[in-house]
Amino acid sequence: MFKKVFGNKNDTKPLKILLKCILDIEAKEIEILNPEILGSSYYDKRTIVDLIVKLEDGTKIGIEMNTNVNKYLIDRNLFYMFKIMSHDIKKGKMYSSLNKHIQINIDCEGKHISPIERYSLMEKEKHKILTDKIEIVR
């Protein structure tokens, strides 16, 4: 049902509303990408994300709806996020061309302190953000 409502390429309005509610962004142009991420080898783990969205500024958003939460959920979603990122830069391109990536994990159990929690890579003691290229939302 989730993919049917939010993954419709012909009607992206529900997806834009979802992104507005979760990320507080006004997405004017969005492109729903192929959710299957192919590996470079036959032996690579097959990866199918619920939704992969590309915004007009190049930001890519992986969205996962999780009905059964387990202790490896975050690890799995990190894996998905980095797989999406690994396809961003092609041979000969500069690392500076890496786009921002956001992984949204919608957890149906909802046992979080606040309705939306946003995480980034930051230094532990001084809380200095290392990069704005990665964000995890749950």
Residue positions per predicted region:
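Elongated, amphipathic alpha-helical interaction scaffolds
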Residues: 1-138
